[in-house]
């Protein structure tokens, strides 16, 4: 098969070569015709050349054998020579047809050739034009860059010139003195707005000239003389104006707040002096300090003197202590006269002085109070005095800071230069008064007034009085503690045997303590202080010991208990009116009262029902120990107890109720004690019933005589007092 394929390929190659030779002969006449191209030079096509690579030929043959036409020809057994002739003929026909088509389209082809040539010429000219345009663009771009560089340089020069112009303009404006400024400074009154405006302009120009002189600017010499003369004139006019305002403070009955308000409108005047004439500024400040210092001192000295004239005529003395014997005979409901005792131990309405409404109320006017014959306790005078001091000090401090342009330590120093003498005088007056003051409530109220005024000053952002408040408290606290300790000592050293006749009603010393303690506790609750509570605790211990010492003077335990209950109840009632229910004082006296009340009820039930109480306790003890059989020997005793209770319980309860109501001054407390005694009696009789229900006593004939427990309760309710 391979040999046949090789032979077929060789035959086909020979046919092609022969056809090519024939075509060359036929095309010979046309080849020499005009306008035709030379025949193709195909080179050497001899397949027998040694240079032909057989392997490659074999590959081509194999590839041709894969052709469908070749496969079909080999399959049908077509004669290859005939087939090649047929193919050659077809190729010649196609070639002739192509030549004829080419000849027919030769004009069009020539026209197309001319058009292409013309287009080439046009494109060449366009290329030349675009080249020239590109060259022009390159030149323009270079020019634009040059212009940009020139523009940037011009902008820099412009900015520099503008900066120089601005600096020069500022310099010239700062140095030039306009005529309006000269006219206003020389001719206008200081109170006119234009004088203030031009004064600010003059201050700015003077500052600018000083700055330029420091830089060595020669032009400053031209205006220095004019500015100096204007400055001297302005300083003179300002000095006269401010000193005149300060001197107006000295006029009698002058409200110095009005000149201060006027000065604040022209506070720039002092700033101008401070920056341009410090000697004059110091002169004005010193004159202000000297004038206001004397005015405040004179005012407060006079006010204090007149204020103390409306104090209560009778005040507490060193003998007006809690434990000092009250020589005056007093009834049960009586209390020390307000005029004679000045409410030493009672608070009353005095506590209102620290209420928000009273604390910042208008100050007292002494001559008005004198005309109305009104009198006040010391704490009211103290509040009025220090509220005036607080209000004026706050206003003065703020004025100093704003007008004299000071703050911090400098403001404190200037404030104390103005108010120092007044504050010292006030402290000396307070120290002198406290030396003979024995009214602890007044001193304690003054302490709380100071604490509240200190908070008000802090809210107003006026720290200048902080040191003064500390000094006042340093005077008040030791005196308060001393008075409290004196009262403690007076109670401790009181001898009950020297107090006269004994009485089971509340003692006047315990009443004093109750009023005094409730007053201090109620005040202290607003701003708690541990030291105060410690001192009150000491006083409470001494009062409790005093009550026990007095109770020991009674011969019977019943009277002792009545005295203790009356005093504890009174102290508890007074404390609960002002102190909180959970305060230590209230809880302490409540426990003491409950304990003594329970003991008194047992003491009260003992005479009429003592036998019943003793039997019930003994029987319950036997039952608890399992010795109930021993109750069989108590039948006679039980019978006697049943019959005795049935015959006497009503009269005993009636007597008991009357005894209680006679013994206790507080009807509510007496009612509570009666109720407690009857309740305990019912419980006792109920326990007696349970004992009699034991098997050992169940068959006792006297059990039929027992009073029904419900009937007893109904009857006892009739003896409950109603108020």
UniProtKB/Swiss-Prot annotation:
Modified residues (N-acetylalanine): 2
Keyword Signal: no
Coiled coil: 107-127, 194-215
UniProt cross-references to InterPro entries, sorted A to Z: Vps52, Vps52_C, Vps52_CC
Phosphoserine modification, residue list: 355
Membrane topology, as annotated: Peripheral membrane protein
UniProt key word S-adenosyl-L-methionine: no
Role summary: Acts as a component of the GARP complex that is involved in retrograde transport from early and late endosomes to the trans-Golgi network (TGN). The GARP complex is required for the maintenance of the cycling of mannose 6-phosphate receptors between the TGN and endosomes, this cycling is necessary for proper lysosomal sorting of acid hydrolases such as CTSD. Acts as a component of the EARP complex that is involved in endocytic recycling. The EARP complex associates with Rab4-positive endosomes and promotes recycling of internalized transferrin receptor (TFRC) to the plasma membrane.
Protein name: Vacuolar protein sorting-associated protein 52 homolog
Organism: Homo sapiens
